UniProtKB/Swiss-Prot annotation:
This is Probable transcriptional regulatory protein NFA_37020. Pfam families: TACO1_YebC_N, Transcrip_reg. It is found in: Cytoplasm. NCBIfam families: PRK00110.1 (NF001030), PRK12378.1 (NF009044), YebC/PmpR family DNA-binding transcriptional regulator (TIGR01033). GO terms for biological process: regulation of DNA-templated transcription. The lineage of its organism: Bacteria, Bacillati, Actinomycetota, Actinomycetes, Mycobacteriales. Its main location: cytoplasm. It comes from Nocardia farcinica (strain IFM 10152).
Amino acid sequence: MSGHSKWATTKHKKAAIDAKRGKLFAKLIKNIEVAARTGGGDPEGNPTLYDAIQKAKKSSVPNDNIERARKRGAGEEAGGADWQTIMYEGYGPNGVAVLIECLTDNRNRAAGEVRVAMTRNGGNMADPGSVAYLFHRKGIVTLEKNGLSEDDVLMAVLDAGAEEVNDLGESFEIISEPGDLVAVRSALQSAGIDYESAESGFQPSVSVAVDAEGARKVFKLIDALEDSDDVQNVYTNVDVSDEVLAQLDTD
């Protein structure tokens, strides 16, 4: 069932992202800069940087912006910020667990913006560890179907360490351990299968089902959080059924 929630969230996000292209570009650029600083500026020797660059390219970030971010992170060019990754935890409407990943150069500003977004949209902050245990870090590769079946994808990635392939309606999501992410992505490339993104993320171990009204409230909270420049990713354990999804589509 988690596939449905992911699909609903992704579909909802895409609509919001179209109106926030500048914010999206800034977040993708930040990912590149941090990846280059952490693992070096050569994408061939730094899989995280490679994947960050590929994701930016898929989202039509100009090559010049990508290259400048890579250079800033690698120290080849001045101007890089001191980015810190901070995780915040909380609960949204209907008791939905929320994990908020920030990448910021100002911890106080990030904390304030997250707190305001949560409290204004039916959420509340939680103590560290009280929500995180409901999620596990996984390698997540997404790809458009393009006529492929679930078996086609499974055959390509099974030996590379893929744990499951989820049908998200218009796309597939491949789940693996984070350490197998590069192998899974490489297996797709070897099979000639194009993919949308490959990155580490958090998958919920337990999900919370919501009705249409609950889903709207959760999506509103996600939107408010993602509107902050400091928020890089928002993970929830909301479960949206096909029936509820159909109701949302008529909104």
